[in-house]
From Swiss-Prot:
Substrate binds at residues 12-13, 166, 195, 300. Keywords: Aromatic hydrocarbons catabolism, Lyase, Manganese, Metal-binding. It comes from Salinispora arenicola (strain CNS-205). SUPFAM superfamilies: Aldolase, post-HMGL domain-like. This is 4-hydroxy-2-oxovalerate aldolase 1. One of its GO terms (biological process) is L-leucine biosynthetic process. InterPro entries: 2-IPM_HCS-like, 4OH_2_O-val_aldolase, Aldolase_TIM, DmpG_comm, DRE_TIM_HOA, PYR_CT. The active site is at 16 (proton acceptor). Mn(2+) binds at residues 13, 195, 197. It holds the Pfam family DmpG_comm. It comes from the Bacteria.
Length: 351
């Protein structure tokens, strides 16, 4: 039986979809619904991780502590988890989250910068936390290079390492190649995870591919008995940056059809998506001309709303901004460059 570890990211990546404006009460309500539906883990933080609330990334409607405490009040079976980006959050922030009830953390770096996660992963492991490495913008490193970065995170103490498609740019073959590369280098006990975005409408398909390839140990052929648990990120109604993440309720329905062990009530997830999350979306989370441009150009999905504001302010097409950001290979943390790009494009149009 293929075993899945489903982690909901509605209350972290989903922050991007509503400009980090969840109230503590909304977090409490959504977390309770996810817990009742049987989800394994629920991630809670500002969209850019612990301590992400700032001028650069956007201020939250509440603090990380308020959001985490609200979720902790209602969870009965789901693991409370969070995300930390070294350089934004610190070990002190992680310690504070742990004291509030967080037992699991993902340490996120750019796909070529695993070495900056060493202290954070090691601290989490030494302090009894479940810890994963999270290699963002995975399309910007080739399979062998990405696997080498994953091996570094494993060496620091990560229980799991993710292929993280922050730009929604990976095709199904790209996911297969990267997961296969992970299998060749990671120890059998190290889990493999997938974090998909839906910018090319491949969020669910890419997650399925990751499971099919990631569940096999070593060089075993596809279809061999599953030997590894695969972690899959998803969110209610796809709530997340860009066109959103793999929609949780859709992925669980597909997993059910595959006969995979997921432990969730698909109807309860459908209800939570429709009744609790979709009404909060001031901008529909969907594939449209702007979010498709993110995936087409391979741009960090959380750049979307920043780019839309810059486009409106400077009178340029948001797609032009996104394509230029992709051409310049901008990555998470370079949000300030979005305005520079918009100004450059506006200047070109005037000359």
């Amino acid at each position: 039986m293929t075993r899945l570890y489903l982690q909901d990211v509605t209350l972290r990546d989903g922050m991007h979809a509503i400009a980090h404006r969840y109230t503590a009460d909304q977090v409490r309500t959504i977390a309770a619904a996810l817990d009742a539906a049987g989800i394994a883990a629920i991630e809670v933080a500002h969209g850019d991780g612990l301590a992400g609330s700032s001028v650069n990334y956007g201020h939250g409607a509440a603090s990380d502590a308020d959001w985490i405490a609200a979720a902790a009040e209602v969870l009965t079976t789901a693991r409370l988890t969070t995300l930390l980006v070294p350089g934004i959050g610190t070990i002190a922030d992680l310690r504070a989250a742990r004291e509030l009830g967080v037992t699991s953390v993902r340490i996120a770096t750019h796909c070529t910068e695993a070495d900056i996660s060493a202290q954070h992963i090691s601290w989490a492991r030494e302090n009894g936390m479940d810890v994963s490495g999270f290699l963002m913008m995975s399309h910007m490193n080739d399979p062998a290079g990405l696997a080498a970065q994953a091996k570094l995170m494993e060496s620091y103490g990560a229980h799991c390492v993710y292929v993280t498609d922050s730009g929604g740019r990976l095709l199904m073959s790209d996911v297969a190649e990267r997961v296969d590369a992970y299998r060749q280098v990671l120890e059998p006990e190290t889990q493999i995870g997938i974090h998909a975005h839906h910018n090319l409408s491949l969020g669910v398909a890419n997650s399925v591919i990751a499971v099919e390839h990631g569940r096999i140990l070593g060089d075993g052929p596809l279809g061999a008995p599953a030997g590894r648990t695969v972690r899959v990120d998803a969110s209610l109604a796809g709530q997340g940056a860009g066109a959103g993440n793999a929609p949780l309720e859709v992925f669980v329905a597909v997993a059910e059809l595959h006969g995979w062990e997921h432990g969730c009530d698909v109807f309860a997830l459908m209800d939570a998506a429709e009744d609790l999350v979709r009404p909060l979306q001031d901008r529909p989370v969907r594939v449209d001309r702007e979010t498709l441009s993110l995936g087409y150009a391979g741009v960090y999905s959380s750049f979307l709303r920043h780019a839309e504001r810059a486009a409106e302010r400077y009178g340029v097409d948001v797609r032009s901004i996104l394509i230029e950001l992709g051409r310049r290979r901008m990555v998470g943390g370079q949000e300030d460059m979005i305005v520079d790009v918009a100004l450059d494009l506006a200047g070109r149009e005037k000359t």
